[in-house]
Amino acid sequence: IIVEPNSIRRKYLNDKCHVISVEKVDQFFSIVVDAVGFKKTREIASAKVSPGGVITHIGLGEDTGGIDVRRITLQEVSFIGTYTYTAGDFMDTAQAIFDGRLGPLDWIERRPLSEGNTAFREIREGKIASPKVLLSPNC
C-alpha cells in the first residue's frame, strides 16, 4: 500500500503502476518505509507502525520533525536510516533506465533550470503529479 496525499500522483499510481495507492490508512503495519522524508511523512510513519515494528527511512526531504519519539520508545519501534548504494548499483540502475527495463518514465517532468525553485515549490504543495523534476539548462 502506498500512502500518497497528492491526488494527482495517487491517480497516476493507481492507473499506470498497478499498485494500491490511498490518501490515508487506518491500519498499522509492521514495516513502514518513508521514501520521502518530510515532517508529514515521518508523522504518518511514526503513527502507523505497529508496536515492535520497523520504520525504514530513506527520504531526505527535510532534516527535522515528525518523529513521535515517546511512542517509538514506549512501543519499542526500530528506526533504521538507509541511504547507500555502490557504484555498481548506480551503473546497473542507469543501464536499466537506458534499456527501458524500468518501464515508461513519463512520471518524470522536465523543466528549464531557471524554473527550479518553482518546480520544487509545486512538488511540496502537491500541484504537480511528478515526484521528480529533471532540470536542464537546455530544456
Language-model region placement:
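Residue-level detector of short coil/turn "hinge" positions at structural boundaries
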Residues: 19-21, 79, 103-104, 130
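Glycine-rich beta-alpha junction loops
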Residues: 6-7, 37, 61-62, 85-86, ...
